[in-house]
């Protein structure tokens, strides 16, 4: 090993993005964790390997055994194998599935959920600090409870349903969470700010998160208050006849609702500016299968970066497959940081090329090189090793080139 590789491999990590379960949720499923709980994102590659005629979401042991050889060398597959070998001394292979389950259950047996997280996340993966994306804290307030996560975790507030709003479910959710009545657009913005206030009272709020790429494209318009109010009024007053039509669900279509969603997006960013909170945004590839990628490049957000120049934007997942494009954006916009969370697992080769390229054009202080983006604590092991190995290879090459 080289000196730089030794340094990287023993270094603690800041996990910039994770979705870990609360202690209570972890304990509820404690007896069900088996070899397949190590798979994480590899489930999507299993689906891809199965082909279009396979039963969607096939999860049987027989299916995993049959398909695993086809995916073991993908980024997802390699992360699973790396973690399994490091944690249990076993390659991830069908002939070891029972032994892996036994080893995993042995590791969590007799440990509280807090001790399980300490063991896997802190001691094994050496992730000393974590930004926790609770996905929907407004709909599930328990995800904001600081006693349900390690002290080293900080939270990112998120409510994506606001940005693709077509009915009153997000409004009702905000009412329940804040205890406020929402009858006007201005009251809705006030309730959104009150929800963020509630998250801040935990003392753990570190960022605002936007994952709307899973539900819509990233192009954001600049609607007026009146345009947004028209959509709000139609959604909130769905008992009325609008254009001769009365409908309970989906009171507006996507085009009509976009004005309201974009208006709330701007309100959200303004709140980040007021509180000096960074904004984490999902760009690029989407988890799972059949995602619509043409609306997800980070370049669609350039008008937002330009308008909100004092807001720090943390752009996720290397915007893969548009990594070079993101590098140019990071070089040009002082308020944009490049984030490689999840990227090493999606495509280790391209992630290494992206990091090497970015180091040639962007100040290294603008690059976040790791985030596991996992749901279960033991999955962090493989993703941490995968990132460290990739980072080490890139730095070794730079040093060999005389830099």
Regions found by a protein language model. Name each.
Residues 2-266, 270, 332-335, 342-348, ...:
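Metal-cofactor-binding active-site regions of metalloenzymes
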Residues 260-333, 337:
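Long, well-ordered mid-to-C-terminal structural blocks that present hydrophobic/aromatic surfaces
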